[in-house]
Design a protein with these regions (language model features):
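Phosphate/NTP-binding elements of NTP-utilizing enzymes
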Residues: 1-133
Length: 133
């Protein structure tokens, strides 16, 4: 995710606005993207209090233990947790928590590759090849 955002900052001509560091990306307006792994560092999430938006990418791999730490940490009024992943198993903790039995306040939006206006042609070709084989 860090590399993707860094590349987009350059591609969109925003390098003068954002300062890209190894652990975070900071905007001149005080906005900040912070990056943390959940698998081995779930306890460090407690330092993320005050976050407005927490985006969990590849969230299918997030354990119940990590969710149990993260969810109460993101408690600023009007804060949001965004979850994106490719479902593997219906029994996966993330899928159960946010799709099968979502919180009343959840907004669940199912998105596929066809909804991505930037979906690369090379991936489309690979996908079609895999379907055919």
């Amino acid at each position: 995710m860090h590399q993707l955002l860094s590349d987009q900052i350059v591609e969109c001509g925003l390098s003068d606005f954002y300062e890209v560091k190894q652990q975070y990306i900071e905007g001149k307006n005080g906005s900040q993207f912070s990056f943390a792994g959940l698998k081995h560092n779930a306890r460090q999430l407690k330092s993320f209090e005050g976050v407005d938006i927490c985006w969990c990418e590849e969230a299918d791999a997030i354990s119940k233990h990590s969710w149990d730490i993260l969810i109460p940490t993101i408690r600023k009024p009007e804060s949001e947790i965004w979850v994106s992943y490719n479902p593997q198993l219906i029994e996966d903790v993330t899928h159960q928590r946010f799709v099968v039995n979502p919180p009343a306040s959840a907004k669940v939006v199912k998105i596929g590759w066809q909804d991505n206006p930037c979906f690369p042609e090379v991936l489309r070709g690979e996908m079609e090849h895999l379907k055919a084989s």
